[in-house]
Amino acid sequence: MKPSLALIALAALLGACASNPSGPTTSFSYAVPDQPEGASGYTEKPGWATQKYAVAAANPLATDAGFQILKAGGSAVDAAIAVQMVLGLVEPQSSGIGGGAFLLHFNGKKVEALDGRETAPAAADEKLFIKADGKPMSFMEGVVGGRSVGTPGTVRMLEKAHQQYGKLPWATLMQPAIVLSEGGFKVSDRLHTLIKSDAHLKKDPVAAAYFYDAKGEAWPVGHLLKNPEYAAVLRKIAAQGASGLMEGEVAQAIVTKVQGHATNPGQLSMADLAGYRSQSRAALCHDYKTSVREFRICGFPPPSSGALAVGQILGILNHANAGAIPLENGQPGANWLHLYTEASRLAFADRGQYVADPDFVQAPGGNWMSLLDNDYLASRAKLIG
C-alpha cells in the first residue's frame, strides 16, 4: 500500500502544480547545485585483518607516517600525533594544528576521552553572529574570516595524550611532517579539486601564494608543494611543546591575523591561547544487542554528538526491526536504507535540540544516557512511516 499512497501523494502534488493560476513556466532550466565539498572519486578496497596494529587516515602519507612511528616502537598515541601533523600539511581543508579534536583512547581495559575541541574567545557573546540590523548572519557571512575562529585545542590535547601514553620523544613525532613540509609533497586529486573550487582562498594573499600559481590557477595534481613555514612552526612545537603554538611569536601571528581580518575580524586573544586547557571526559558507553551477539559500544560524549548519534541510530533501527530486512545482492536495499535514513534524521534532530557544550548546557533529565533509553528509542522508532 505504501508505494500506492506515495504515487497518490505525488499525483496530488503534481496536480496542484499544474493548477498554478499564473500558468505554466516554460523558461525553467534546472541548475545543478555546487557540491558542498569537491569529490575526489571512490576507490573500492578489500578489507584487512591484523593481529598487531593498523593505521587509517585520510591520506596515504599520513597513514605511512603513523605506520613508521609504530614500527619504531611508538604507541598508538604517538602514531596518532604523527598522523595529525602530516594531515595538517596534506589535508589542510579538513584538519590541522589550528583547529580542535577529540581523542578516544582504549588501553585494553579502560576507555578515556580527551577533549581538545576549540573554545570560543572569552570576548564572544550572543551577538557574535548577529548583523547590525539585528538579523543573524548567513553561514558564509559568519564563517569566512576571523569572526568564526575559536581557540585551537588540538596540539594542547595531543600533548596531554603524549604525557600519558607516549613512548617516543615528542620531537620525534614532528619529524615526518617536517620532512614532508621542507622536501615537498605531491598535490593529491582531492587537494587539487578543493583548492580549484574554493571561492575564498584567492582573497587572502598568503593562501593565494601557497595554493595557486602566478596566473591564479590551482596547483595541478602531482605538483611538488613545499611549506617551510609550517615546518618552522612544527620545529617550535617540537622544542617547546604546545606552548610553541599557543604562546610567543606564533600565537601573536595568529591573533594578529584573526583580529586584523579586513572584512570580518575576530576576537581571539593571546590570553585565550595561553589559557586553553584540554579536558578529560568520561567516555559514553552503552550495550547494543543484535540477534547474534551483544556489544559494548563506547564513544565520545558531548560536546561531541558522535556516541549519542550512533547509539540512537542503532537503537532505533533495532526497534524498527531493520535486521529482519534481507540484503539485496549483498547490499542494503531501499527498505533498509529508508529505515536508516529516517533513524539518522531522528538522531540528528535530537542532536540539534539537546547536544551542546556540557560546561554550559545540561543533559535532558540530567543524564546524556536518557537519550539512549530503550523506551525512548522505541517511541522514536514509531515515528518512522
Language model feature labels by segment:
Residues G23-D64, Q68, A76-V77, I81-G241, ...:
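Noncatalytic scaffold domains of N-terminal-nucleophile
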Residues Q312:
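Protein kinase glycine-rich loop
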Residues V32-P33, G266, H319-G385:
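Internal maturation/activation junctions in enzymes
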Residues L14-A16:
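C-terminal motif of bacterial Sec signal peptides marking the signal peptidase cleavage site
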Residues A307-L308:
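Flexible, polar/acidic helix-loop-strand segments at domain edges
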Residues M1-A6:
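Bacterial N-terminal signal peptides that target proteins for export
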Residues A18-P21:
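Bacterial signal peptide processing site
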